[in-house]
Regions:
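Nucleic-acid processing machinery
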Residues: 1-20, 34-40, 49-62, 66, ...
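N-terminal glycine-rich anion-binding loops that anchor highly charged ligand groups
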Residues: 25-29
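Generic alpha-helical structural context detector
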Residues: 31, 57, 99-102
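N-terminal glycine-rich flavin-associated loop
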Residues: 72, 76
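Hydrophobic or amphipathic alpha-helical targeting/insertion segments
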Residues: 77, 88-103
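Active-site-proximal helix-loop-helix substrate-binding element of RNase H-like nuclease domains
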Residues: 98-101, 107-113
Length: 275
């Protein structure tokens, strides 16, 4: 997919949930970021603008944030990594967008050196507190998610460092903010580099048993659904496969092998009211 096609896909995604979005300003942010990053490359060798586009896509597709957030996501690295200034972004776009971009840059500069549980919790609280506008931390988490998705281009040392940060800082914050799908993906991607053998073992098992687990999940879901109907309880039952890190953590906590973990399925019961 070309850069232009990726941008058009972003616009399509935003239009799907916010047709009144300011697409003129969003395009201006894209064009400004593309020009600012024009001489920069990712570790993969791709043009750097691929990254802000991907972050904006996550902000739109996963979080469905407003126009300002999309613009800030596209611009999130221009103050940190190019000659662009806060004043320039403020003048061309808005003071709010400039503050969002500067806020993301400030979070990027924080050094993570401690591993003490209490200090890690304080660091998580500090990150949230520093984000006077909650959209700052949402954009930063989206930034980290895309970086984790493309971590294969980094050195092994960098992979482990960023994965540990992600597991200890960003996944818990995502959980705290109710971003469950992003939290799961951050955990799985971190596990991939922190324990590649354990990760591959679990993923291979899930892939080999996928249809079996799907059938099992469907049968149990029907049983739960039927029983709740008998009780005249208005409800919705969701079933999903447990993600690799969830299984890995259970193996560790219960000191069991993968073959001893028999419940790869999780259920959520949403109860509206009794009739």
């Amino acid at each position: 997919m070309t850069i232009q096609e990726q941008y058009e896909n972003l616009e399509k995604t935003v239009r799907g949930y916010n047709p009144a979005a300011d697409f003129q300003h969003i395009r201006a942010a894209f064009e400004f970021a593309a020009e600012a990053h024009k001489d920069q490359k990712r570790k993969s060798g791709e043009p750097y603008i691929i990254h802000p586009l991907a972050v904006a896509q996550i902000v739109a597709e996963e979080l469905r944030l407003d126009s300002e957030s999309i613009e800030a996501a596209l611009l999130h690295d221009v103050i940190e990594d190019t000659a662009a200034t806060h004043e320039q972004v403020s003048k061309l776009f808005s003071p709010t967008i400039a503050d969002l971009v500067e806020g993301v840059s400030k979070l990027t500069r924080i050094q993570y050196a401690t591993k003490e549980d209490e200090q890690m919790e304080n660091l998580r609280k500090m990150l949230i507190a520093m984000s006077k506008d909650i959209r700052v931390i949402l954009i930063k988490i989206s930034d980290r998610l895309h970086n984790m998705r493309t971590m294969e281009y980094q050195s092994p040392a960098k992979q482990k460092q960023k994965s540990l940060e992600t597991m200890e800082i960003y996944a818990p914050i995502a959980h705290r903010l109710g971003m469950q799908r992003i939290k799961w993906e951050l955990e799985d991607l971190s596990l991939k580099y922190l324990d590649p053998i354990g990760y591959e073992e679990i993923v291979s098992k899930l892939e080999a048993k996928h249809q079996e687990y799907e059938d099992f999940m469907r049968r149990i879901q029907i049983q739960i659904d039927d029983r709740l109907k008998e009780l005249d309880i208005d409800h919705i039952v969701y079933g999903r496969m447990k993600h690799p890190y969830s299984i890995y953590r259970k193996m560790f906590n219960q000191n069991k092998s993968l073959d001893e973990i028999f419940d790869p399925v999780s259920y959520t019961h949403l109860r509206a009211h009794e009739t």
